[in-house]
């Protein structure tokens, strides 16, 4: 099936973002493991797996539309401590959210409702799961302090 080229090109941009998010979560999860924060490791490892699924969904759709997936990832923003890792991941999720909203609009204009629905599902996951959880963690750090937060993540 030949898809709208603008949609395919934009999905490749989204794929690049998902690959970067996956790799960033991978590195951050391993940092958490190294630092002894088991709960943070487990959560970020789970997020990495979800980002891999998001990337796979885009790859399958790009192929279905007759395109070639571009596997180059966007730049990573690697933190140096728990707070900077959480903030970097939240910024990445905000960027993904904004890109998905733009992609949804493009798909509607191109009348590609299947690609649109894929992006809507990923937007829901980004806003209601990933970004929300990261916002909660940063809010907890503000409320209970870094030391208490770190202790809760062992």
From Swiss-Prot:
List of residues binding Fe cation 2: 51, 93, 127, 130
SUPFAM superfamilies registered for this protein in UniProt: Ferritin-like
Protein purpose: Iron-storage protein, whose ferroxidase center binds Fe(2+), oxidizes it using dioxygen to Fe(3+), and participates in the subsequent Fe(3+) oxide mineral core formation within the central cavity of the BFR protein shell.
Gene Ontology biological process: intracellular iron ion homeostasis; iron ion transport
Keywords for this protein: Ion transport, Iron, Iron storage, Iron transport, Metal-binding, Oxidoreductase, Transport
Organism of provenance: Neisseria meningitidis serogroup A / serotype 4A (strain DSM 15465 / Z2491)
Database matches in InterPro entries: Bacterioferritin (IPR002024), Ferritin-like (IPR012347), Ferritin-like_diiron (IPR009040), Ferritin-like_SF (IPR009078), Ferritin_DPS_dom (IPR008331)
Assembly with partners or alone: Heterooligomer of 24 subunits, arranged as 12 dimers, that are packed together to form an approximately spherical molecule with a central cavity, in which large amounts of iron can be deposited.
Single annotated GO MF: ferric iron binding
Name of the protein described by the UniProt record: Bacterial ferritin
Record-level GO cellular component terms: cytosol
Residue ranges annotated for the Ferritin-like diiron domain, each copy included: 1-145
Similarity comment: Belongs to the bacterioferritin family.
Residues that bind Fe cation 1: 18, 51, 54, 127
PANTHER family noted in UniProt: BACTERIOFERRITIN
Catalyzed reaction equations: 4 Fe(2+) + O2 + 4 H(+) = 4 Fe(3+) + 2 H2O; Fe(2+)(in) = Fe(2+)(out)
Known EC number: 1.16.3.1
